[in-house]
């Protein structure tokens, strides 16, 4: 099941039983958890919602076995799975959970495919994949979010914005909110405002810096480099980015030494 199907299930009030939430897109995953939380009336969440962090099997089953109070259902959010859990036992338990309980197992990143509980949920179509969003979805999300807050953002400008910030939705959300706050209700987000207010991804900033040097704009290139190095997190990001590039160069060199042409190496 993809994240869109899961959101539709929430909107249709169709959540029943246990679900596994996994994948690299943590922002969308968190949004799904917030949407599911709204299934429980706010006044009764203290009674009918439990949030657990790497619980043992007894704590997890106890939370699921607790009957709802002043309502007809209970939401249990399990953040992470502790090592050493009796997974076969839990895999069997989710088959006989009370119908009043909804269990959401929230895994950061990818879940262990060898885990018997994960296998069971996948086999039953209860594993929700939160993969990196395609650019088209990011553009639509940006336009919709801006519109909800009274700002105007067209698709071409949204594409420029996404190209600058990258595909991490947490960064997208933070930077977009800055733009919305800058233009205010009824304002229009333009490329000029984006260029003045948005912090681009490390990859984008590095390539922009290199473009300055290759175009002979040494002063602009040095200014961009110093700007990056002044930010400790950016400096670490540059190191990580360059490391990944060097690894690709080394892999390409090995392939060429093995007899592959440069064109074949680019496609590999």
Show which residues each predicted segment covers.
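Conserved beta/loop motifs at nucleotide-recognition and modification sites
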Residues: 1-268
């Amino acid at each position: 099941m993809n994240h869109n199907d899961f959101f539709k299930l929430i909107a249709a009030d169709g959540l029943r039983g246990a679900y596994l939430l996994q994948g690299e897109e943590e922002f969308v995953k968190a949004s799904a958890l917030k949407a599911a939380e709204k299934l429980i009336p706010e006044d009764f969440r203290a009674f009918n919602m439990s949030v657990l962090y790497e619980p043992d099997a007894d704590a997890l089953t106890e939370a699921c076995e607790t009957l709802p109070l002043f309502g007809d259902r209970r939401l249990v959010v399990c953040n992470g799975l502790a090592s050493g859990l009796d997974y076969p036992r839990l895999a069997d338990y989710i088959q006989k959970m009370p119908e009043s309980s909804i269990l959401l197992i929230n895994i950061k990143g990818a879940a262990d495919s060898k885990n018997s509980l994960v296998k069971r949920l996948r086999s039953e179509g209860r594993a929700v994949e939160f993969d990196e969003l395609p650019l088209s979805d990011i553009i639509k999300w940006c336009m919709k979010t801006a519109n909800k807050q009274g700002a105007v953002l067209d698709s071409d400008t949204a594409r420029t914005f996404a190209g600058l910030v990258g595909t991490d939705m947490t960064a997208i959300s933070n930077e977009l909110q800055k733009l919305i706050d800058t233009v205010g209700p009824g304002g229009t987000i333009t490329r000029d405002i984006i260029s003045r207010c948005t912090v681009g991804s490390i990859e984008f900033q590095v390539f922009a810096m290199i473009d300055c040097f290759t175009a002979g704009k040494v002063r602009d290139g040095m200014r961009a480099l110093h700007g990056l190095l002044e930010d400790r997190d950016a400096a670490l990001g540059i190191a990580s980015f360059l490391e990944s590039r060097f690894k690709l160069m080394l892999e390409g060199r090995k392939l060429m030494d093995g007899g592959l042409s440069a064109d074949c190496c680019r496609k590999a």
